[in-house]
Amino acid sequence: MNILITGGTGLIGKALVKSLSGEHRLTVVTRDITKAKETLDSLSQNSPVSFIDSIDAIDDMARFHAIVNLAGEPIADKRWTTSQKKRICNSRWDTTAQLVAKINSASSPPLVFLSGSAIGVYGDKGSQAVSEETPPHSEFTHELCAKWEAIANTVDGHNTRVCTL
């Protein structure tokens, strides 16, 4: 399969690239291609990873069988100031909206779009077990994840299956 990955240099993305690179052709969207190559080339198994620096560089999503969207400003690296919250949100929402637009306009869209989310959709429940039926708690992480998932789910589902992680 030919797979497009955003957020490929993050914690989950690096593990995913390592796992998939032996059997699939991977293209990673990254802001810093040089740094991404340094990080990921040693992880990829017998299969070189391709890199692009912008979703806009993709003419048509038809070449991809799947898209894995893990992009986003790290959530735990800095204090959640108003400006940091904005970066956290926009880095996820804007990237996802760009991908959705590309998928929906593709001549032959990918079969699946996997888009990140987080346990944060449920908020701080302490030791309480949560499931998909657990009602969300209104706080920053819930609002972040709820909108992120809502944007991902605007993909035309007739052609592309959407999975939020």
Predicted regions and their residues:
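Conserved beta-loop-beta element that borders a ligand/cofactor-binding pocket
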Residues: S117, A150-L165
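Conserved Rossmann-fold NAD(P)-dependent oxidoreductase catalytic core, especially the SDR/UDP-sugar
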Residues: T96-E139
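N-terminal Rossmann NAD(P)H-binding glycine-rich loop of SDR-like oxidoreductase domains
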Residues: I3-E23
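N-terminal Rossmann-fold cofactor-binding loop
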Residues: V29-T34
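NAD(P)H-binding glycine-rich loop region in Rossmannoid oxidoreductase-like domains
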Residues: S44-Q98
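Flexible cofactor-recognition loop at the NAD(P)H-binding site
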Residues: G10, G72-E73, I119
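Short-chain dehydrogenase/reductase
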Residues: K86-W93, V130, T134-E149
